[in-house]
Design a protein with these regions (language model features):
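Short alpha-helical transmembrane segments in multi-pass integral membrane proteins
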Residues: 1-18, 76-141, 185-241, 297-364, ...
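Residue-level signal for short hydrophobic patches within transmembrane helices
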Residues: 7, 11-30, 34, 57, ...
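Transmembrane helical elements of multi-pass membrane transporters/channels
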Residues: 16-35, 137, 148, 171, ...
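Helix-terminus/linker motif at the lipid-water interface of multi-pass membrane proteins
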Residues: 26, 30-48, 118-125, 181-188, ...
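Interfacial/gating helices of multi-pass transporter permease domains
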Residues: 39-59, 125-130, 190-191, 232-239, ...
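Small-residue-rich hydrophobic transmembrane alpha-helices
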Residues: 48-108, 145-164, 271-335, 368-390
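Hydrophobic transmembrane alpha-helices of multi-pass small-molecule transporters
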Residues: 60, 175-179, 205-209, 281-284, ...
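Short runs within selected transmembrane alpha-helices of multi-pass transporters and secretion channels
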Residues: 69, 137-156, 164-172, 193-206, ...
């Protein structure tokens, strides 16, 4: 069901759109959690550390691909808000063509140099082979991952957040089955977990595209929609590439953090991996709000309804407090139990290290919520430069804290790097939005004054 977000109560629309996205994000985390749980329970702590050590590298590459996919969805939301269905179908056609090209460009070098990338991350010698077996398969499946995100981005661009959810639920069951079969029965080790994820993503992508074209006639492309239009390609990439670079820049900061954690040994790596998984699950309301605001702002910008943008962003600001509070409580109260889901009988040292990160992160969840809401909102408003630069600020904030705090404070100092990145970036994005808002209000007031003079 497509949803016009340019009419109706903004808070209600944002929440109704967000619920399926939240469930979808949780199932996306469920993919990763099932991989991690089964790897940790059946293959041991070293295998878990190996899979965990690839997380930031996956985020770097897949985040770039998925950022571009989200950018395509933003352009679809602009066309849908403007009620320009011919342009909308052209954006869909270009999205499909660019997905093929970009995924090929990303797949070849990452598969070829996966081991070298792990070496640059200071991956411990005892887990690097296991990590490489996992990440090579993930990189080989970039097309499947990007295709699903393009399909879901297009659907969300027209306000349909339910269809992507249905197929994620279906494919999550397949992922569980394949995890158990490929790891426990076939005994493919860490590679089996990667195969399960890629196959599940591929199934989800295929089904999503089939239903997308059958269910929504406005998305059904014809031969006339597939033509080379460099102007529109540039427009799509001008939105998609900053979003992609933002993911990648953030990922580089995470890689620096992961590299700093790796020097403390495989036990601490396993603890950090489990804690990061717990934090990701606890904070899923935040990227959910971000996705909703990108679509909401994109549609209303296309429709020229700036007052609705102001009201929606104000409502989202208040929702950030709820999201941050819920995430902090979950990390602090359920953290030990959730860490135990990822590591079978964790040692006291491992559990302590995991909870150290969660306690530090919980204090500063609110700035993290601001990042998702205001970064995605600004990107939906076709203001991609500052969100991209905010990623650079995240990178330097993490790096600076690691340089300053890692030696005197050890692992605790490294954990504080995320907090510094969230705080500085969240403030920058809020200030940027407020400046944009004041400029738009001033422009609208000037236009109204001119119209009154004419009358």
């Amino acid at each position: 069901m497509r949803k016009d977000m340019t009419i109706g109560n903004p808070m209600k629309i944002i929440l109704l759109f967000s619920l399926p996205v939240l469930l979808g994000n949780l199932f996306q985390q469920f993919y990763n959690m099932v991989d991690t749980v089964i790897v940790g329970q059946y293959l041991g702590e070293d295998a878990l550390a190996a899979v965990g050590s690839t997380g930031c590298l996956m985020f770097l590459v897949l985040g770039f691909a998925n950022g571009i996919a989200q950018g395509f969805g933003v352009m679809v939301s602009h066309a849908f808000g403007a009620k320009d269905m011919k342009l909308l179908r052209h954006y869909v056609a270009l999205s499909l063509l660019l997905t093929v090209v970009i995924s090929m460009i990303l797949t070849v070098p990452t598969v070829a140099f996966s081991r070298q990338l792990l070496l640059w991350l200071n991956t411990p010698e005892n887990i690097i082979t296991l990590a490489n077996r996992y990440i090579r398969v993930i990189f080989a499946g970039i097309f499947a991952t990007m295709a699903y995100n393009v399909a879901s981005g297009i659907l969300r661009g027209i306000g349909d957040s339910r269809t992507p959810l249905y197929f994620l639920i279906l494919s999550s069951g397949l992922n569980i089955f394949l995890d158990i079969f490929l790891i426990v029965v076939v005994k493919l080790g860490t590679a089996g977990a990667a195969y399960a994820t890629v196959i599940s993503q591929a199934v989800s992508a295929v089904l999503c595209f089939i239903v997308m074209f059958r269910k929504h006639d406005i998305l059904r492309t014809t031969r006339e929609d597939y033509y080379c239009d460099f102007h529109e390609i540039r427009r799509m990439l001008s939105v998609g590439i900053p979003m992609a670079l933002n993911y990648s820049i953030t990922a580089i900061g995470t890689m620096i953090l992961q590299s700093a954690v790796n020097v403390f040994g495989s036990s601490v790596v396993a603890a950090f991996t489990a804690a990061s998984k717990v934090s990701n699950i606890a904070t899923q309301t935040m990227p959910t709000l971000g996705t909703a605001m990108a679509t909401y702002c994109g549609q209303n910008l296309g429709a020229g309804k700036h007052d609705r943008i102001f009201r929606g962003m104000k409502d989202a600001f208040y929702l950030c407090f709820f999201a941050a509070g819920a995430a902090a409580l979950l990390c602090c109260l359920a953290g030990p139990t959730m860490v135990g889901c990822f590591i079978h009988n964790p040692s006291e040292q491992t559990l302590h290290a995991a909870m150290q990160y969660l306690h530090i992160a919980s204090i500063f969840m609110l700035p993290l919520a601001w990042i998702f809401v205001y970064r995605n909102g600004l990107q939906g408003l076709d203001r991609g430069l500052v969100p991209m630069l905010s990623g650079v600020l995240e990178l330097f904030s993490r790096y600076a804290v690691i340089l300053i705090a890692a030696k005197p404070f050890g692992y605790v100092g490294v954990c504080s790097a995320d907090v510094a990145a969230w705080l500085t970036t969240g403030i920058l994005l809020i200030v940027t939005y407020m400046i944009w808002k004041q400029r738009v209000k001033k422009q609208l007031n000037a236009e109204n004054a001119t119209m009154n003079c004419i009358k």
